[in-house]
Amino acid sequence: MNGDEKLGIWLYRTSLVVLVLFFVGFSVVVPIDAMAQASRSTNDALNTFIVVGAFVAFGVLSIIIAVGRVLVQRSCLQDIPKGYLPITPEDMPHQPSRSMILEQMDRSHKLAVLLKKPKEPVTHDGLARPDSDDHGLPPLLNYEDSIKIITSRLKYQGVFSNLVKLDSDTGDTFATIARSMSAQNKLSSSEAAEYIKLYEAIRFSGKEITKEQFLQFMDRSIFFLDSLISTGSIEPRSHRAGDGQKNYSFPPTRAQNTLTTPLQQYVTDYADNESVDTTNIIFPRSPDYALESSSALHYLTTTNTSSTVARKVTPSSYRKDFSGLNETASEEAFRGNNHLKLNDNESYDSVVKRC
Protein backbone atom coordinates (compact mmCIF):
# COMPACT_ATOMS: atom_id res chain seq x y z
CA MET A 1 0.00 0.00 0.00
CA ASN A 2 1.58 3.29 -1.14
CA GLY A 3 1.34 6.75 0.45
CA ASP A 4 -1.57 7.98 -1.67
CA GLU A 5 -3.72 4.99 -0.69
CA LYS A 6 -2.95 5.49 2.99
CA LEU A 7 -3.77 9.22 2.75
CA GLY A 8 -7.08 8.45 1.07
CA ILE A 9 -8.03 5.94 3.78
CA TRP A 10 -7.21 8.42 6.56
CA LEU A 11 -9.23 11.22 4.88
CA TYR A 12 -12.20 8.86 4.47
CA ARG A 13 -12.13 7.78 8.11
CA THR A 14 -11.65 11.36 9.40
CA SER A 15 -14.51 12.75 7.35
CA LEU A 16 -16.76 9.89 8.45
CA VAL A 17 -16.04 10.59 12.13
CA VAL A 18 -16.69 14.32 11.72
CA LEU A 19 -20.00 13.78 9.94
CA VAL A 20 -21.16 11.29 12.57
CA LEU A 21 -20.33 13.76 15.36
CA PHE A 22 -22.20 16.56 13.58
CA PHE A 23 -25.23 14.34 13.08
CA VAL A 24 -25.30 13.28 16.73
CA GLY A 25 -24.79 16.87 17.92
CA PHE A 26 -27.61 18.31 15.83
CA SER A 27 -29.86 15.40 16.75
CA VAL A 28 -29.36 16.19 20.43
CA VAL A 29 -29.68 19.98 20.02
CA VAL A 30 -32.95 19.92 18.06
CA PRO A 31 -35.13 18.43 20.83
CA ILE A 32 -33.47 20.63 23.47
CA ASP A 33 -34.03 23.78 21.39
CA ALA A 34 -37.65 22.77 20.77
CA MET A 35 -38.30 22.43 24.49
CA ALA A 36 -36.57 25.77 25.22
CA GLN A 37 -38.64 27.62 22.61
CA ALA A 38 -41.85 26.06 23.87
CA SER A 39 -41.14 27.12 27.45
CA ARG A 40 -41.10 30.81 26.45
CA SER A 41 -44.45 30.63 24.66
CA THR A 42 -47.73 31.26 26.48
CA ASN A 43 -49.71 28.84 24.28
CA ASP A 44 -49.66 25.39 25.95
CA ALA A 45 -51.17 23.60 22.94
CA LEU A 46 -48.54 24.96 20.63
CA ASN A 47 -45.80 24.08 23.09
CA THR A 48 -47.00 20.49 23.34
CA PHE A 49 -47.23 20.14 19.56
CA ILE A 50 -43.70 21.49 19.06
CA VAL A 51 -42.11 19.20 21.65
CA VAL A 52 -43.93 16.03 20.59
CA GLY A 53 -43.37 16.76 16.91
CA ALA A 54 -39.63 17.24 17.45
CA PHE A 55 -39.27 13.86 19.18
CA VAL A 56 -41.37 12.08 16.54
CA ALA A 57 -39.38 13.61 13.69
CA PHE A 58 -36.12 12.58 15.37
CA GLY A 59 -37.29 8.99 15.83
CA VAL A 60 -38.63 8.61 12.30
CA LEU A 61 -35.46 10.03 10.78
CA SER A 62 -33.28 7.68 12.82
CA ILE A 63 -35.34 4.65 11.78
CA ILE A 64 -35.19 5.62 8.11
CA ILE A 65 -31.42 6.01 8.20
CA ALA A 66 -30.88 2.65 9.97
CA VAL A 67 -33.23 0.68 7.69
CA GLY A 68 -31.80 2.31 4.59
CA ARG A 69 -28.29 1.33 5.58
CA VAL A 70 -29.32 -2.31 6.09
CA LEU A 71 -31.13 -2.48 2.74
CA VAL A 72 -28.23 -0.95 0.85
CA GLN A 73 -25.75 -3.37 2.43
CA ARG A 74 -27.90 -6.42 1.60
CA SER A 75 -28.40 -5.31 -1.98
CA CYS A 76 -24.64 -4.97 -2.37
CA LEU A 77 -24.05 -8.45 -0.91
CA GLN A 78 -26.58 -10.01 -3.31
CA ASP A 79 -24.55 -8.81 -6.27
CA ILE A 80 -21.54 -10.84 -5.11
CA PRO A 81 -21.49 -14.41 -6.55
CA LYS A 82 -21.73 -17.19 -3.97
CA GLY A 83 -18.61 -18.92 -5.24
CA TYR A 84 -16.54 -15.76 -5.22
CA LEU A 85 -13.47 -15.50 -2.97
CA PRO A 86 -12.12 -12.07 -2.00
CA ILE A 87 -8.53 -12.50 -3.12
CA THR A 88 -7.94 -9.21 -4.91
CA PRO A 89 -6.61 -6.06 -3.19
CA GLU A 90 -9.82 -4.20 -4.09
CA ASP A 91 -11.96 -6.81 -2.31
CA MET A 92 -9.64 -7.37 0.66
CA PRO A 93 -7.10 -4.61 1.28
CA HIS A 94 -5.54 -6.54 4.20
CA GLN A 95 -2.50 -8.27 2.73
CA PRO A 96 -2.01 -11.00 5.44
CA SER A 97 -5.63 -12.09 5.01
CA ARG A 98 -5.25 -12.39 1.25
CA SER A 99 -2.02 -14.37 1.68
CA MET A 100 -3.67 -16.79 4.12
CA ILE A 101 -6.55 -17.42 1.70
CA LEU A 102 -4.18 -18.11 -1.18
CA GLU A 103 -2.06 -20.49 0.94
CA GLN A 104 -5.11 -22.46 2.06
CA MET A 105 -6.32 -22.73 -1.54
CA ASP A 106 -2.96 -24.18 -2.61
CA ARG A 107 -3.03 -26.60 0.34
CA SER A 108 -6.57 -27.74 -0.52
CA HIS A 109 -5.51 -28.45 -4.09
CA LYS A 110 -2.56 -30.59 -2.95
CA LEU A 111 -4.72 -32.52 -0.47
CA ALA A 112 -7.36 -33.15 -3.13
CA VAL A 113 -4.75 -34.76 -5.37
CA LEU A 114 -3.39 -36.91 -2.53
CA LEU A 115 -6.76 -37.99 -1.13
CA LYS A 116 -8.57 -38.50 -4.42
CA LYS A 117 -7.98 -42.26 -4.26
CA PRO A 118 -6.85 -43.87 -0.99
CA LYS A 119 -3.82 -46.11 -1.18
CA GLU A 120 -5.05 -48.58 1.44
CA PRO A 121 -8.32 -50.56 1.13
CA VAL A 122 -11.21 -48.81 2.85
CA THR A 123 -13.22 -51.12 5.10
CA HIS A 124 -16.24 -49.92 7.04
CA ASP A 125 -17.38 -51.68 10.18
CA GLY A 126 -20.61 -53.61 9.91
CA LEU A 127 -20.35 -54.36 6.19
CA ALA A 128 -18.02 -56.37 3.99
CA ARG A 129 -16.16 -54.72 1.15
CA PRO A 130 -17.94 -54.50 -2.22
CA ASP A 131 -15.01 -56.11 -4.06
CA SER A 132 -13.28 -59.44 -3.51
CA ASP A 133 -12.14 -60.19 0.02
CA ASP A 134 -9.11 -62.17 1.13
CA HIS A 135 -11.22 -64.07 3.68
CA GLY A 136 -13.80 -65.19 1.14
CA LEU A 137 -16.65 -63.07 2.52
CA PRO A 138 -19.46 -62.22 0.07
CA PRO A 139 -19.52 -58.63 -1.17
CA LEU A 140 -21.42 -56.17 1.04
CA LEU A 141 -22.20 -58.85 3.62
CA ASN A 142 -24.09 -57.41 6.59
CA TYR A 143 -22.37 -58.77 9.69
CA GLU A 144 -25.23 -58.05 12.08
CA ASP A 145 -27.89 -59.73 9.93
CA SER A 146 -25.66 -62.77 9.43
CA ILE A 147 -25.07 -63.19 13.16
CA LYS A 148 -28.79 -62.85 13.84
CA ILE A 149 -29.57 -65.61 11.34
CA ILE A 150 -26.86 -67.93 12.69
CA THR A 151 -27.90 -67.51 16.32
CA SER A 152 -31.59 -67.87 15.43
CA ARG A 153 -30.93 -71.18 13.70
CA LEU A 154 -28.85 -72.35 16.62
CA LYS A 155 -31.69 -71.45 18.96
CA TYR A 156 -34.76 -72.60 17.02
CA GLN A 157 -33.45 -75.27 14.61
CA GLY A 158 -30.76 -76.99 16.63
CA VAL A 159 -27.12 -76.52 15.73
CA PHE A 160 -27.56 -75.02 12.26
CA SER A 161 -29.21 -78.18 10.91
CA ASN A 162 -31.36 -79.62 13.72
CA LEU A 163 -28.55 -81.81 15.00
CA VAL A 164 -29.24 -81.36 18.69
CA LYS A 165 -32.52 -81.63 20.53
CA LEU A 166 -33.37 -78.47 22.44
CA ASP A 167 -35.94 -78.53 25.24
CA SER A 168 -36.09 -74.75 25.59
CA ASP A 169 -38.78 -72.16 25.92
CA THR A 170 -39.42 -69.56 23.26
CA GLY A 171 -38.34 -66.78 25.60
CA ASP A 172 -34.92 -68.25 26.35
CA THR A 173 -31.99 -66.12 25.25
CA PHE A 174 -29.10 -67.27 23.11
CA ALA A 175 -26.83 -67.27 26.16
CA THR A 176 -29.22 -69.58 28.02
CA ILE A 177 -29.41 -71.95 25.05
CA ALA A 178 -25.62 -72.06 24.61
CA ARG A 179 -25.02 -72.72 28.31
CA SER A 180 -27.65 -75.45 28.33
CA MET A 181 -26.17 -77.16 25.27
CA SER A 182 -22.62 -76.97 26.63
CA ALA A 183 -23.76 -78.43 29.96
CA GLN A 184 -25.76 -81.24 28.35
CA ASN A 185 -22.84 -82.24 26.14
CA LYS A 186 -20.16 -81.71 28.82
CA LEU A 187 -18.29 -79.01 26.93
CA SER A 188 -15.82 -76.65 28.52
CA SER A 189 -17.67 -73.98 30.49
CA SER A 190 -14.90 -71.45 29.84
CA GLU A 191 -15.17 -71.94 26.07
CA ALA A 192 -18.95 -71.49 26.22
CA ALA A 193 -18.54 -68.39 28.42
CA GLU A 194 -16.10 -66.81 25.95
CA TYR A 195 -18.43 -67.65 23.07
CA ILE A 196 -21.39 -66.03 24.85
CA LYS A 197 -19.28 -63.03 25.90
CA LEU A 198 -18.22 -62.44 22.30
CA TYR A 199 -21.82 -62.71 21.10
CA GLU A 200 -23.15 -60.26 23.69
CA ALA A 201 -20.34 -57.80 23.00
CA ILE A 202 -21.17 -57.88 19.30
CA ARG A 203 -24.94 -57.67 19.65
CA PHE A 204 -25.38 -55.25 22.55
CA SER A 205 -22.34 -52.97 22.55
CA GLY A 206 -24.07 -50.41 20.35
CA LYS A 207 -21.10 -50.29 17.99
CA GLU A 208 -20.73 -51.56 14.45
CA ILE A 209 -19.34 -55.08 14.13
CA THR A 210 -15.78 -55.17 12.87
CA LYS A 211 -14.47 -57.69 10.39
CA GLU A 212 -12.19 -59.23 13.02
CA GLN A 213 -15.09 -59.70 15.44
CA PHE A 214 -17.23 -61.32 12.75
CA LEU A 215 -14.50 -63.76 11.68
CA GLN A 216 -13.77 -64.62 15.31
CA PHE A 217 -17.47 -65.26 15.96
CA MET A 218 -17.69 -67.51 12.89
CA ASP A 219 -14.61 -69.47 14.01
CA ARG A 220 -16.04 -69.97 17.47
CA SER A 221 -19.45 -70.93 16.07
CA ILE A 222 -17.86 -73.62 13.89
CA PHE A 223 -15.77 -74.78 16.85
CA PHE A 224 -18.90 -74.91 19.03
CA LEU A 225 -20.73 -76.98 16.41
CA ASP A 226 -17.84 -79.36 15.88
CA SER A 227 -17.42 -79.75 19.63
CA LEU A 228 -21.03 -80.87 19.90
CA ILE A 229 -20.50 -83.33 17.05
CA SER A 230 -17.29 -84.66 18.61
CA THR A 231 -18.96 -85.26 21.97
CA GLY A 232 -21.42 -87.64 20.34
CA SER A 233 -24.50 -85.47 20.75
CA ILE A 234 -25.66 -86.51 17.27
CA GLU A 235 -25.05 -90.22 17.61
CA PRO A 236 -27.92 -92.54 16.63
CA ARG A 237 -30.93 -91.98 18.87
CA SER A 238 -32.99 -94.95 19.98
CA HIS A 239 -36.69 -94.56 19.52
CA ARG A 240 -38.83 -93.94 22.54
CA ALA A 241 -41.04 -96.78 23.72
CA GLY A 242 -44.35 -96.82 21.98
CA ASP A 243 -43.76 -93.82 19.73
CA GLY A 244 -43.81 -95.93 16.58
CA GLN A 245 -40.82 -94.10 15.04
CA LYS A 246 -37.73 -95.59 13.47
CA ASN A 247 -34.11 -95.04 14.47
CA TYR A 248 -32.11 -92.35 12.70
CA SER A 249 -28.44 -91.61 12.64
CA PHE A 250 -26.28 -88.86 11.17
CA PRO A 251 -25.00 -89.31 8.50
CA PRO A 252 -27.87 -91.59 7.36
CA THR A 253 -27.30 -95.25 6.66
CA ARG A 254 -28.30 -97.02 3.47
CA ALA A 255 -31.46 -98.34 5.12
CA GLN A 256 -32.49 -94.87 6.21
CA ASN A 257 -31.83 -93.47 2.76
CA THR A 258 -34.34 -95.92 1.34
CA LEU A 259 -37.05 -94.53 3.60
CA THR A 260 -39.39 -91.85 2.39
CA THR A 261 -39.58 -88.90 4.74
CA PRO A 262 -41.67 -85.75 4.34
CA LEU A 263 -38.53 -83.78 3.53
CA GLN A 264 -37.42 -86.28 0.89
CA GLN A 265 -40.88 -86.19 -0.64
CA TYR A 266 -40.74 -82.39 -0.71
CA VAL A 267 -37.39 -82.42 -2.51
CA THR A 268 -38.69 -85.00 -4.99
CA ASP A 269 -41.77 -82.92 -5.78
CA TYR A 270 -39.72 -79.74 -6.25
CA ALA A 271 -36.52 -81.20 -7.66
CA ASP A 272 -36.49 -78.76 -10.56
CA ASN A 273 -37.12 -75.69 -8.43
CA GLU A 274 -33.82 -73.81 -8.16
CA SER A 275 -35.15 -71.54 -5.41
CA VAL A 276 -35.39 -74.36 -2.88
CA ASP A 277 -32.65 -74.07 -0.26
CA THR A 278 -31.47 -77.59 0.47
CA THR A 279 -28.93 -76.57 3.10
CA ASN A 280 -31.16 -78.05 5.78
CA ILE A 281 -32.56 -81.06 3.87
CA ILE A 282 -29.57 -82.95 2.50
CA PHE A 283 -29.96 -85.58 5.25
CA PRO A 284 -33.12 -86.91 6.90
CA ARG A 285 -33.88 -85.30 10.22
CA SER A 286 -34.29 -86.98 13.54
CA PRO A 287 -37.85 -87.94 14.53
CA ASP A 288 -37.42 -85.59 17.49
CA TYR A 289 -37.86 -82.79 14.97
CA ALA A 290 -40.74 -84.27 12.99
CA LEU A 291 -42.68 -81.53 11.23
CA GLU A 292 -46.35 -81.41 12.12
CA SER A 293 -47.51 -78.97 9.44
CA SER A 294 -46.80 -78.18 5.83
CA SER A 295 -46.10 -74.54 6.72
CA ALA A 296 -43.25 -75.58 9.02
CA LEU A 297 -41.91 -77.85 6.28
CA HIS A 298 -42.06 -75.02 3.75
CA TYR A 299 -40.23 -72.68 6.15
CA LEU A 300 -37.38 -75.09 6.78
CA THR A 301 -36.96 -75.92 3.12
CA THR A 302 -37.14 -72.38 1.76
CA THR A 303 -35.30 -70.42 4.45
CA ASN A 304 -32.98 -68.02 2.68
CA THR A 305 -29.30 -68.51 3.49
CA SER A 306 -27.90 -66.30 0.77
CA SER A 307 -27.32 -63.50 3.30
CA THR A 308 -25.12 -65.72 5.46
CA VAL A 309 -21.66 -67.06 4.87
CA ALA A 310 -23.06 -70.56 4.36
CA ARG A 311 -23.08 -71.81 0.78
CA LYS A 312 -26.56 -72.03 -0.66
CA VAL A 313 -27.04 -75.52 -2.13
CA THR A 314 -29.62 -75.89 -4.88
CA PRO A 315 -30.81 -79.20 -6.33
CA SER A 316 -28.69 -78.71 -9.44
CA SER A 317 -25.52 -77.88 -7.52
CA TYR A 318 -26.11 -80.80 -5.15
CA ARG A 319 -26.50 -83.23 -8.06
CA LYS A 320 -23.41 -81.76 -9.72
CA ASP A 321 -21.25 -82.11 -6.59
CA PHE A 322 -22.43 -85.44 -5.16
CA SER A 323 -24.27 -87.39 -7.86
CA GLY A 324 -21.15 -89.36 -8.87
CA LEU A 325 -20.22 -90.41 -5.33
CA ASN A 326 -21.24 -93.69 -3.80
CA GLU A 327 -22.35 -94.00 -0.20
CA THR A 328 -18.86 -94.59 1.18
CA ALA A 329 -17.35 -91.67 -0.70
CA SER A 330 -20.19 -89.39 0.37
CA GLU A 331 -19.71 -90.25 4.02
CA GLU A 332 -15.94 -89.73 3.75
CA ALA A 333 -16.48 -86.35 2.08
CA PHE A 334 -18.90 -85.37 4.80
CA ARG A 335 -16.52 -86.38 7.57
CA GLY A 336 -13.65 -84.52 5.93
CA ASN A 337 -15.63 -81.31 5.59
CA ASN A 338 -17.48 -81.25 8.88
CA HIS A 339 -14.99 -82.43 11.48
CA LEU A 340 -11.90 -80.78 12.86
CA LYS A 341 -10.85 -84.06 14.54
CA LEU A 342 -11.15 -82.58 18.00
CA ASN A 343 -9.71 -84.31 21.00
CA ASP A 344 -11.69 -84.67 24.21
CA ASN A 345 -12.13 -81.31 26.00
CA GLU A 346 -9.83 -79.56 23.52
CA SER A 347 -10.03 -75.75 23.70
CA TYR A 348 -10.64 -73.31 20.89
CA ASP A 349 -7.18 -71.72 21.21
CA SER A 350 -5.44 -75.08 20.93
CA VAL A 351 -7.35 -75.89 17.74
CA VAL A 352 -6.35 -72.54 16.23
CA LYS A 353 -2.68 -73.15 17.07
CA ARG A 354 -2.81 -76.69 15.72
CA CYS A 355 -4.39 -75.61 12.43
Curated annotation (Swiss-Prot):
Amino acid composition bias (Polar residues), ranges on this chain: 246-255
Keyword list (alphabetical) reads: Membrane, Transmembrane, Transmembrane helix
Q: Which residues lie on this side of the membrane: Cytoplasmic?
A: 1-15, 69-355
Q: Its GO CC terms?
A: membrane
- From the record, give the transmembrane residue ranges: 16-36, 48-68
Extracellular compartment segments: 37-47
Quote the InterPro entries the UniProt record gives.
DLT1 (IPR038869)
Q: Does the keyword Thylakoid apply?
A: no
Give me the ranges of the annotated region Disordered.
236-255
Topology versus the membrane, per the UniProt entry? Multi-pass membrane protein
* Superkingdom classification of source: Eukaryota
The subcellular localization recorded is: Membrane
Signal sequence region: none
Please state which protein family the record places this protein in.
Answer: Belongs to the DLT1 family.
Q: What does this protein do?
A: Required for growth under high-pressure and low-temperature conditions.
Name of the protein this chain belongs to: Defect at low temperature protein 1
